[in-house]
């Protein structure tokens, strides 16, 4: 039996974090790691205190996950991405020179946040 390398290990933690998401379209997890220690985790979902996927207007309108336009009107998705949540719950000191592990390739907006955060390296599965 072989042990996973550090990247595999922390991607596994990101995968576990993704399971907390109640998004019916895509479950994404992220982990901030510095000096081989977890500094923060995040998963995609509605902001704290807001309606999650099961009660959001987008779902109640009959929008089909992965098919409907999620960018406007009653079907606008309010979810905060996993990467953003992980970054928001870290101290700035924890981000400088850290690695971000994500269960899929970050979107354009998250890539900009990551670039501005001080994260030095981003790891995600090749098949994402």
Swiss-Prot record:
Catalytic activity of the protein: dCMP + H2O + H(+) = dUMP + NH4(+)
The enzyme's E.C. designation: 3.5.4.12
One of the record's GO molecular function terms: zinc ion binding
InterPro entries (UniProt xref): APOBEC/CMP_deaminase_Zn-bd, CMP_dCMP_dom, Cytidine_deaminase-like, dCMP_deaminase, dCMP_deaminase-rel
Residues holding Zn(2+): 81, 107, 110
Catalytic EC class: hydrolase
Top-rank taxon: Viruses
Assigned keywords, A-Z: Hydrolase, Metal-binding, Nucleotide biosynthesis, Zinc
Domain CMP/dCMP-type deaminase as annotated: residue spans: 5-128
GO biological process: cytidine deamination; nucleotide biosynthetic process; pyrimidine nucleotide metabolic process
One Pfam family here: dCMP_cyt_deam_1
Catalytic center residues: 83
Family: Belongs to the cytidine and deoxycytidylate deaminase family.
Name used for this protein in its record: Deoxycytidylate deaminase
């Amino acid at each position: 039996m072989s042990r996973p390398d550090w990247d595999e290990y922390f991607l596994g933690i990101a995968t576990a974090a993704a399971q907390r998401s109640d998004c019916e379209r895509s479950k994404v997890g992220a982990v901030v790691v510095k000096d081989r220690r977890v500094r923060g985790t995040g998963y995609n979902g509605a902001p704290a205190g807001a309606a999650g996927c099961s009660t959001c207007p987008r779902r109640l309108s009959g929008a089909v996950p992965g098919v409907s336009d999620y960018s406007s009107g009653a079907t606008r998705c309010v979810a905060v991405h996993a990467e953003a949540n992980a970054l928001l719950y870290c101290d700035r000191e924890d981000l400088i020179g850290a690695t971000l592990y994500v269960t899929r390739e970050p979107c354009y907006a998250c890539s900009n946040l990551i670039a501005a955060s001080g994260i030095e390296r981003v790891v995600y599965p090749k098949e994402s």
